[in-house]
Amino acid sequence: MYVVSTKQMLNNARRGGYAVPAFNIHNLETMQVVVETAASMHAPVIIAGTPGTFTHAGTENLMALVSAMAKQYHHPLAIHLDHHTKFDDIAQKVRSGVRSVMIDASHLPFAQNISRVKEVVDFCHRFDVSVEAELGQLGGQEDDVQVNEADAFYTNPVQAREFAEATGIDSLAVAIGTAHGMYASAPALDFSRLENIRQWVNLPLVLHGASGLSTKDIQQTIKLGICKINVATELKNAFSQALKNYLTEYPEATDPRDYLQSAKSAMRDVVSKVIADCGCEGRA
């Protein structure tokens, strides 16, 4: 069985003191680079997709592609719903074979966040599907979820325990100063808050908004309990910039099989660096 749940992946990471990277994929080339690089480095990875990605590719198509590539490379993969907000949408994808879900109700008041998340957890656990939820909000935009910086807030450690116990989630995404998108300057991460959250919450912790973070910051968050690192914008930027550069240099290029190679090479550098930063090479 090559398409797996994230639950065992993250529990292994927690015990082993490393993190599993979750790469948001946007097209076939992104998927190829992530899987090929992970297989070559014998690293566990999570294939993540926002609602927009599943709409773009088609849920059945995406599931079939993940399954085929996992078998081709003899490498276990998890496919994960990132920042999904609608119960019916999640339920449909779970019934299609998805075994890892992030329900994002972090924009709701605390009690409503608990209620919405618990509804999803109760459904998903019937299918042995692991569930991640977020307490606190990151600034920036992820797919169609946008949070103004002024509205972003950090995770409260005491509330985090209540939230985890009331919902029954399998992992908790925390807000400690990261944001979706790339950073104009290095963010000031609240490491002491993260350490407190780890003391209050007995679950694998997840860091969103990791694109552009320094190796030092990533590794420090892992030491303090982060077991899953999300990367999206960094891959998109590498792909887009390499493609622009190639077509500027070779404006007559017309064959995507040729000009997409530069974009894949740029993404490969990102994926291999993130895997190294997470300390998960050789852990698959």
UniProtKB/Swiss-Prot annotation:
EC numbers: 4.1.2.40
Reaction(s) catalysed by this chain's protein: D-tagatofuranose 1,6-bisphosphate = D-glyceraldehyde 3-phosphate + dihydroxyacetone phosphate
GO molecular function annotations of the record: tagatose-bisphosphate aldolase activity; zinc ion binding
Cofactor note (record): Binds 1 zinc ion per subunit.
This protein's UniProt keywords: Galactitol metabolism, Lyase, Metal-binding, Zinc
Xref: Gene3D superfamilies: Aldolase class I (3.20.20.70)
Protein name: D-tagatose-1,6-bisphosphate aldolase subunit GatY
Naturally occurring in which organism (per UniProt): Escherichia coli O1:K1 / APEC
